[in-house]
Regions:
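Exposed beta-sheet edge and beta->alpha loop/turn motif
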Residues: 89-147
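Unusually extended, aromatic-enriched hydrophobic runs near protein termini
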Residues: 24-25, 49, 143-147
Length: 147
């Protein structure tokens, strides 16, 4: 009987560990999506950016901002994330918020700070989904994201 209890406790521990790991990886998945969007922006790929921002292409103001950002912030160099402040960090269930990201492409160019509208759907422990809705024009280095 004791072996069954130990076995059950081990299985319970493994199941809980797996669920916690899934919850914690949601942060990495969000960050990867935002960084992919920034890479497209740095490469000047506004069409790729619009594919990552569902609904933005149908909104003239959003579409124009994305095209202008991609054109203005395009450049060579290696993208480096200097600071990443997620508005949805460690959300267990769905959440929406602004993620503030400061990034640099090296060289003499100044750092860029932008806000990305992020939505998490579903439960993080079951994978959930990460949806990016919009990216702001560059904001001041000490500015906060709206909302």
């Amino acid at each position: 009987m004791r072996i069954w209890r130990v076995g059950l406790l081990i299985l319970l521990f493994l199941a809980v560990s797996f669920l916690i790991a899934r919850w914690l990886t949601a942060e990495n998945r969000e960050r990867a999506a935002v960084v992919s969007l920034l890479h497209l922006q740095k490469e000047g790929d506004s069409a790729g950016m619009l594919r990552m921002l569902p609904g933005c292409g149908q909104q003239p103001k959003c579409r124009a901002a994305v095209v202008a950002d991609a054109r203005r912030l395009q450049g060579a160099g290696t993208l480096t994330v200097l600071r990443y402040d997620s508005g949805t960090s460690y959300s267990f269930a769905g959440a929406s918020g602004q993620t503030r990201v400061a990034w640099d492409r090296g060289g003499a160019t100044p750092a860029v700070v932008q806000c990305v509208s992020v939505e998490r759907r579903g439960l993080a422990i079951f994978g959930g989904s990460i949806i990016l809705h919009a990216i702001s024009l560059p904001i001041g280095g000490e500015s906060t994201c709206p909302g």
